[in-house]
A protein has these predicted regions:
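A short, active-site helix/loop in glycosyltransferases that binds the activated sugar's phosphate group
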Residues: 84-107, 142-144
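N-terminal pre-catalytic "stem/leader" segment of glycosyltransferase-like enzymes
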Residues: 1-55, 278-283, 288
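Short acidic alpha-helix that forms the nucleotide-activated donor recognition element
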Residues: 169-180, 201
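Active-site proximal beta-strand in glycosyltransferases
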Residues: 42-72, 86-89
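Catalytic binding pocket for nucleotide-activated donors in carbohydrate/polymer assembly enzymes
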Residues: 191-270
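Conserved catalytic-core segment of nucleotide-activated headgroup transferases in glycan assembly
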Residues: 97-100, 116-173
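A conserved, positively charged/aromatic
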Residues: 76-85
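Acidic donor-binding loop of glycosyltransferase active sites
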Residues: 178-191
């Protein structure tokens, strides 16, 4: 039986919860500990700091995804001479941003997402029994939010607004999801996007005003790098548009198809503890 040492306390709370669930599923013993304990463990995971792995030829190392949004020279300190290390990014687009930089150093980069809590975020009402509509707003231009609210008004919709930057209570969000007919997403780049995935897990169809580039984040200094708000998505989840001019037509299609979407199925097939756990098992196996 393998065991894992998890170092550092910078792990995102949702990642931590998902990681523990996966390790339990795989029957891998684990401990949140210190670099001085490496000798006692088979697999070492550090989400946010480099470790010189050249000192530990017989261990397996997993790093990321919390080093930084963009490639960082911190990775140079990993020194993967034994080919026993891997860096993880939660989605394809975020991996692609790192790849050109990481090619210069001997460190494989793999797409690995953390699971959604499908037990907590699960529906208990059919869509026809739900009556709420919400907007999830995160780091986009406030003018765009006003355009959406104005559009809703014309459709006689009064949406609940969850503003990521202003913070909100997760229990309120969960309560809304359980009672939501649909949600509208106004978000910038997401490499994982837990709040969106949690809505899908509650079987809430989503209408997404998506981004194409990172500089669409409000007041950001990012370059025009390709990205998305919904890295985990297929046609069962809802509809996507990119420009306010497309909203009316996309909304019409979305409402017509509202009862046909199956977002929870998508989550169960791609982001459940079991599915992500299998990917973790493969990730570990593939480290030499």
């Amino acid at each position: 039986i393998m065991n894992m040492l998890i170092i550092g306390n910078e792990i995102h709370v949702k990642n931590k919860e998902g990681l523990e669930k996966m390790l339990n599923e795989l029957k891998i013993k684990y401990k949140f500990g210190h670099i001085s304990e490496i000798d006692k463990y088979d697999i070492i995971y550090h989400p946010s700091q480099a470790i010189d792995t050249s000192k530990y030829p017989n261990k397996k190392f997993i790093f990321g995804p919390h080093f930084s949004t963009f490639p960082t020279n911190k990775l140079l300190d990993i020194k993967n001479v034994h080919n026993n290390s891997v860096y993880i990014q939660p989605s394809i687009w975020s991996k692609e941003i790192w790849e050109p930089h990481i090619k210069k150093i001997n460190l494989p980069i793999k797409v690995f997402s953390f699971p959604v809590n499908t037990e907590k975020f699960k529906p208990d009402k059919k869509i026809e029994e739900r009556d709420r509509i919400f907007i999830y707003f995160k780091r986009r231009n406030p003018h765009e939010l006003l355009l959406l609210i104005d559009f809703c008004k014309k459709k006689n919709i009064i949406p609940f607004v969850f503003d990521y930057v202003k913070r909100y209570n997760e229990e309120d969000y969960l309560d809304c999801l359980k009672n939501a007919k649909f949600g509208i997403i106004l978000d910038a780049h997401e490499s994982q996007g837990f709040a969106i995935e949690e809505a899908l897990s509650c079987n809430v169809p989503l209408l997404v005003w998506n981004v194409k580039t990172m500089n669409q984040e409000y007041r950001s200094t990012y370059r025009e790098l390709s990205c998305t708000s919904v890295p985990y998505w297929d046609e069962r989840c809802g509809e996507i548009f990119y420009n306010i001019k497309e909203l009316e037509d996309t909304f019409k299609i979305f409402i017509e198809k509202l009862h046909t979407y199956e977002p929870r199925k998508y989550i169960e097939e791609n982001l459940s503890v079991e599915k992500c756990g299998k990917k973790l098992e493969t990730l570990i196996k593939d480290i030499k």
